[in-house]
Amino acid sequence: MGIRSYQAYPPGTRDGSIVNSKEMVNSKEMIESEPQKVLVRGRHIARGRNHRGIITSRHRGGGHRRLYRMIDFRRDKRDVSGEIKTIEYDPNRNTCICLTNYGDGKKRYILYPHGIEIGNKIISGIEAPISIGNTSPLSTNMPLGASVHNIETRPGRGGQLVRAAGTTAKILAKEGQLVTLKLPSGEIRSLPQKCFATIGQIGNIDANNLKLGKAGSRRWLGKRPSVRGVVMNPIDHPHGGGEGKVPIGRKKPLTPWGHPALGRKSRKRRKYSDTLILRRRMA
């Protein structure tokens, strides 16, 4: 289990839980060390503001200071074997990261695949064997039903799909130049067979069971409070105004900008990938 529940001594920790990295890795060899300096950079936090200081994304700001670990989503070290040296904590995500030492002397961080251990060998290439942590195109000998993550949407672009903690996608079919995948959201879509993907499931399978327990835990993550529109003034929200505790005064709920809040599709119309989506994600 990668989730550890709090004891309910103070009210703030009642029903709260945290991510326990050591239990998630299920290994006594997890390294608690400083990250590699060459693989770390400062992280500019925009706090939900644009270049003029105007809020463009609400409920963001604050949070604990942290350094960003540069993750190798491209896995473009073709046919160069690497060894897992450490499994480290990453404050920027709910899963761990693995420091990989390659045969040419380079070091890179990758996402922690569930079940991998320190000392294991990984490789990326067209002829990479079917093993946890290896990366290869979807067109090679990946069997139907295989679990993959860190999937490219276009060849050479780097992994963009299925990168969250505990997620995985399954290969359903191969036809022509396309491969059909079932994503964690329930969406079924096709991708070019030349796209690379990493074999296995991302660590921390119990990430969806995480409960922060108190408002302060959200503030540590850089998430500010979400205020209901019905308690605002009319100038701030369509639901605002009225004497005392009153209904919203509308037939349907609206966003702060006056658009329908429930049931309206937010996906961009006539997107290039619409033809590749065979079934939309489950709401």
Swiss-Prot record:
Its main location: plastid. Keywords: Plastid, Ribonucleoprotein, Ribosomal protein. Residues 262-271 have a biased composition (Basic residues). One of its GO terms (molecular function) is transferase activity. Transmembrane segments: none annotated. Residues 229-274 are annotated as: Disordered. One of its GO terms (biological process) is mitochondrial translation. SMART domains: Ribosomal_L2 (SM01383), Ribosomal_L2_C (SM01382). It is found in: Plastid. Gene3D superfamilies: 2.30.30.30, Nucleic acid-binding proteins (2.40.50.140), Ribosomal protein L2, domain 3 (4.10.950.10). SUPFAM superfamilies: Nucleic acid-binding proteins (SSF50249), Translation proteins SH3-like domain (SSF50104). GO terms for cellular component: mitochondrial large ribosomal subunit; plastid. Part of the 50S ribosomal subunit. PANTHER family: LARGE RIBOSOMAL SUBUNIT PROTEIN UL2M (PTHR13691:SF5), RIBOSOMAL PROTEIN L2 (PTHR13691). Belongs to the universal ribosomal protein uL2 family. This is Large ribosomal subunit protein uL2c.
